[in-house]
From Swiss-Prot:
GO CC terms in record: chloroplast thylakoid membrane; phycobilisome
Keyword Electron transport tagged: yes
Lineage of source species: Eukaryota, Rhodophyta, Bangiophyceae, Bangiales, Bangiaceae
A Pfam family hit: Phycobilisome
Result for mutant: residue 162 to A: In strain: NBD
SUPFAM superfamilies for the chain: Globin-like
InterPro entries: Globin-like_sf, Phycobilisome_asu/bsu, Phycobilisome_asu/bsu_sf
Gene3D superfamilies named among the record's database cross-references: Phycocyanins (1.10.490.20)
Presence of keyword Electron transport: yes
Modifications made to the protein after synthesis: Contains two covalently linked bilin chromophores.
Name of this protein: R-phycoerythrin alpha chain
Bilayer topology term: Peripheral membrane protein
Subunit structure: Heterodimer of an alpha and a beta chain.
Length: 164
């Protein structure tokens, strides 16, 4: 799984060298942000059901046509699958916060997602709206510290940009 630490070590090993000073500074910065990432991961884990429900609700509020006949959410089963997908991505955000890199999203979420959604007639814009809502709903310090919020929002931005 890709993280700042594994990427740094892999690059140094591939070049047959020890990690450079700048490599080590990057790793140290990553380690210093670890407490904030873990705080964000803990808050997300303890509130994930509400986060997923609110994000999914925001998606269907913004794109109400999705519940029309022939659309991606025209049955309760399809609506449930959309919420399931949002839940899946929020778990991946949690994993990314824990490992300190985008590896979980890259490996289990992004690869081929746009193509799958297009094939199934699921608009990626609806998922983007869900993740943007989850990001924008964050209230510092009510929900988490400022640095934890930066880490959380950064991971959601990564998913949003990957789906656009």
């Amino acid at each position: 799984m890709k993280s700042v630490i594994t990427t740094t070590i892999s690059a140094a090993d591939a070049a047959g060298r020890f990690p450079s000073s700048s490599d080590l500074e990057s790793v140290q910065g990553n380690i210093q942000r670890a407490a904030a990432r873990l705080e964000a991961a803990e808050k997300l884990a303890s509130n994930h059901e509400a986060v997923v429900k609110e994000a999914g609700d925001a998606c269907f509020a913004k794109y109400s046509y999705l519940k029309n006949p022939g659309e991606a959410g025209d049955s309760q089963e399809k609506v449930n699958k959309c919420y399931r997908d949002v839940d899946h991505y929020m778990r991946l955000v949690n994993y990314c916060l824990v490992v300190g890199g985008t590896g979980p999203v890259d490996e289990w979420g992004i690869a081929g997602a746009r193509e799958v959604y297009r094939t199934l007639n699921l608009p990626t814009s609806a998922y983007v709206a869900s993740f943007a809502f989850a990001r924008d709903r964050l209230c510092v310090p009510r929900d988490m510290s400022a640095q934890a919020g930066v880490e959380y929002a950064g991971n959601l931005d990564y998913i949003i940009n990957s789906l656009c």
